[in-house]
Design a protein with these regions (language model features):
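Residues at the starts of beta-strands that form the adenosine-phosphate
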Residues: 3, 33, 130, 153-155
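Intrinsic disorder/low-complexity segments
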Residues: 115-130, 186
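Glycine-rich adenosine-cofactor-binding loop
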Residues: 8, 95-103, 110, 114, ...
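Rossmann-like adenosine-cofactor binding region
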Residues: 171-199
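NAD(P)-binding Rossmann-fold cofactor-contacting core
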Residues: 150-172
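Short glycine-rich anion-binding loops that position phosphate/pyrophosphate groups of nucleotides
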Residues: 61-68, 137-139, 195-198
Length: 199
């Protein structure tokens, strides 16, 4: 049996098994199963060992482990390296590689709302648009990276714990950090990355 997992804590809310098992059944992948597993930080090393031993084929990673998993990996792809956030991992040439698909997924959504054009004036559709991000969780660096790739140059971030916001500012120096509870200037786009989005 080819086993795939989504790991996190909490994990009860995850619809990933429902979605993935539906498609596995539809495409007659009867030798595959996708499960969710609630883990603690101490379990991360064991997850990697399960992949090394081919007990698990691939793993999706959700809160709070997107950054915590990195030290256990052999390699990161470009987007995971840039964002310092991993949400997918599997074995490639006997190495456990971490990927970040959040960046591409959010980028696709942004491009639908703000399409690029052949017109050089709107080649970077988010240039000059003020964006306010609430929260500095595991997906935030992926969102900032996707926004920047579409020309965003005016991103404001606010988080309850300023240390986490400042960590992101180290990755993205042009980011403006606003103290929690302060009102931002009028923004064109507001993005919530707090844990309230899990409910």
């Amino acid at each position: 049996m080819r086993k795939y997992l989504v790991i996190g804590n909490p994990i009860g809310h995850s619809l990933s098994p429902l979605i993935h098992n539906h498609w596995m059944k539809k495409y007659h992948l009867s030798d595959s199963v996708y499960e969710k597993r609630k883990i603690e930080e101490k379990d991360l090393k064991n997850i990697i060992e399960e992949i090394r031993k081919d007990e698990v084929v691939g793993v999706n990673v959700t809160v709070p482990f997107k950054k915590l998993i990195i030290p256990f990996l052999d390699q990161l792809d470009f987007s995971a390296e840039e964002t310092q956030s991993v949400n997918t991992l599997f074995k490639v040439d006997n190495k456990i590689v971490g990927y970040n698909t959040d960046r591409a997924g959010f980028g696709d959504t942004i491009r639908e709302a703000y399409p690029r054009s052949n017109d050089p004036i709107i080649l970077r559709p988010l240039e000059g648009i003020r964006i306010f991000i609430i929260g500095a969780g595991g997906v935030t660096s992926s969102i900032i990276s996707a926004l920047k790739s579409e020309g965003a140059d005016n991103i404001i971030l606010s988080n309850r714990t300023k240390e986490k916001a400042n960590e992101l500012k180290k990755l993205f120096p042009e980011l403006e950090v606003l103290d929690w509870g302060k009102r931002p200037p009028i923004c064109n786009i507001v993005i919530n990355t707090t844990s309230i989005g899990l409910t």
